[in-house]
């Protein structure tokens, strides 16, 4: 079964205390080119500069409610950063598995959020 509007609303409510609202910006040039209103959600203003924090928080909050105290994931960057940041916020253990060679910038941000790689 896929996502439902009720499930999406529940997830939004669950993560609300942990995320900031991001701006919705009209893409004027793209709108003119396509002859339609095009709007872009700017997720680069989040703590991890990606929407990935939203999914990580939603999943980890649900896991915490079931007693999970440590999680692991495999990621080349943005998802790992989201999980690391969520782990820091929720005070649960996180292990991030990244392929070699590791992107130095993404690894540094992940380590900054206290997640071992």
Positions of predicted regions on the chain:
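PLP-dependent amino-acid enzyme catalytic core
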Residues: 1-117
């Amino acid at each position: 079964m896929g996502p439902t509007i009720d499930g999406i609303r529940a997830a939004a409510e669950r993560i609300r205390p942990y995320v900031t609202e991001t701006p919705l910006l009209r893409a004027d040039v793209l709108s003119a080119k396509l002859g339609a209103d095009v709007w872009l959600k700017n997720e680069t203003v989040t703590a991890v500069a990606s929407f990935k924090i939203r999914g990580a928080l939603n999943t980890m909050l649900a896991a915490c409610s079931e007693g999970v105290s440590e999680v692991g994931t495999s990621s080349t960057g943005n998802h790992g950063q989201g999980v690391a940041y969520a782990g820091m916020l929720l005070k649960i253990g996180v292990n991030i598995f990244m392929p070699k060679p590791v992107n130095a910038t993404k690894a540094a941000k992940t380590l900054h959020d206290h997640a071992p790689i």
